[in-house]
Amino acid sequence: MNRLLSVLVVAVSSAALTARAANPGDEVVVVYNTRVPESKAVADYYAARRLVPTDQIFGFALSTNEDMSRMEFRDALQKPLAQALKKRKLWQIGQTIIPATTNRPGRVEWKPVKSKIRYALLCYGVPLRIEKDPNFTELGMENLRPELRRDEAAVDSELALLPLIEEKLPLAGPMRNALYGVTNSAWLQPTNGILLVTRLDGPTPGIARGLVDKALQAEADGLWGRAYFDLRNITDPAYKPGDDWIRAASEICRRVGFETVVDENPGTFPAGFPMSQIAIYIGWYDGNACGPFAQPTVEFMPGAFAYHLHSFSAATLRSTTQYWVGPLLAKGATITMGCVAEPYLAGTPDVAVFTARLIFNGFTFGEAAYAAQQVLSWQTTVVGDPLYRPFGKSPDRLQRELAARDSKLADWSYLRLVDINQVAGKPLAELIAFLEQLEATKRSAVLSEKLADLYAAQGKPSSAVYTYLQALQLDPSPQQRIRLLLTLGEKFLAQDRTQDAYEDYQKLLHEFPDYPDKLAICRKLLSLAQKLDKKTDAENYQAEINRLSPPPPKP
């Protein structure tokens, strides 16, 4: 066991555990809308939870809509915030000499030469988007591609360049992020021209407040659960980078020990897919939350990151059903990102970089989000606690703390340990022996399911079925229970255990009468009923199939 634990420590400890501020809240300014009472309430709540000094909380009179004009952004938010930071001596702007390069002459840049803060948090009620000005024109914009000759932007993304306010940057199109891909989080600060801006936002003030609560819970207990990735299996060179990013993110999660599911089908995850205990979800490409995410309950774990790549995924944050960001937050995600308007693929976050920085490098959410963006002053909004750092504790420390509290989350730590060793090529027999000898396996649906999976991979179907049945008795989550029943049905069929398969699928429909893919289960039951010569049951299932089947297309 100690040998296996050492692999876990090496695999996940990373370069993450770097020095941090004694009180991270000192590095945050909190911004709210004085015209929205709930905005100040969210700001005060966050400041209390993260110990943000009261003189770093700023209120401005802003639009009460999600959109604001460019003029309002400049005069009511951008300039007043910059002035407030200067007045409170939170940063000091001065001249910085930028040496010449082979491609660019030397120049003087005005930006902060000292800064006490690195993050800005925009609270529920602060507008989301700077509106497009149809009459906008700017010198030099004719050099941009036609589709980039626009001045609308996410408020977050525009404010990220607040340290360069004296530079009078162009407004048309995106600005290159010179810190894209950085591996040293210390570079991500105003003295290098960037402010890490996120939002505590969502469909309701309560959802917004809950984001910091879940972040703090995950920092204390760890981010545990499963990782799901939804590819399109696309070959078009214009869109393939999206798949490449997501695939690379999935490989990172697999290597650090997440139970990882990768869907290669062009469509999104179907509604009936049993998506249990979600720690990470990254996918594309649908306009509105769909499939498992449109169900009444989604099993997001505390601290979960969920992101769906779509051009308008954050067109509004107020809806629980439209687009993606609002619904994901409403269903329990802790951190997410999205686009307020068409960004084009290269203008969206590189989720491979994001995942690597969050996990391998131990960045905070705010740091990882901005290290992953190739451009700023563009369309990405970043929603969640910027200080959230899910991989800030070493794995061995987390394991000790969870075990000392007799927390069931320790089961996930053991699961990650097994998965890391499996990826490293350890023999299945060794992993099976570890789980068989582990006392926690006897009481854990999570570990018993893994043990059953290993038996199946080892070619021991009877042992696998027995252990899947054991897992069903150990209080699995609803979605895990569905997955176990579906898996058992397949295993029974493979072993010609027709009666067992029949009873298994009946149990699924009995326990989950609203299962989204009820039609598929009824078809299986019809076939099994016919095979077992259960004529009345077969007639009933045929009637149910007729009722559930979509009508044929009109001629």
List each language-model region with its residue ranges.
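Single-residue signature of alpha-solenoid repeat helices
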Residues: 430-431, 464, 501, 538
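Register position in tetratricopeptide repeats
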Residues: 423, 457, 491-494, 527-531
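Bacterial N-terminal signal peptides
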Residues: 6-16
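Alpha-solenoid helical repeat scaffolds
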Residues: 435-436, 469, 506, 523, ...
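Short solvent-exposed coil/turn linkers within tandem alpha-helical repeat scaffolds
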Residues: 440-443, 474-480, 509-518, 535, ...
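Cysteine-dependent hydrolase recognition
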Residues: 22-436, 441-444, 458-462
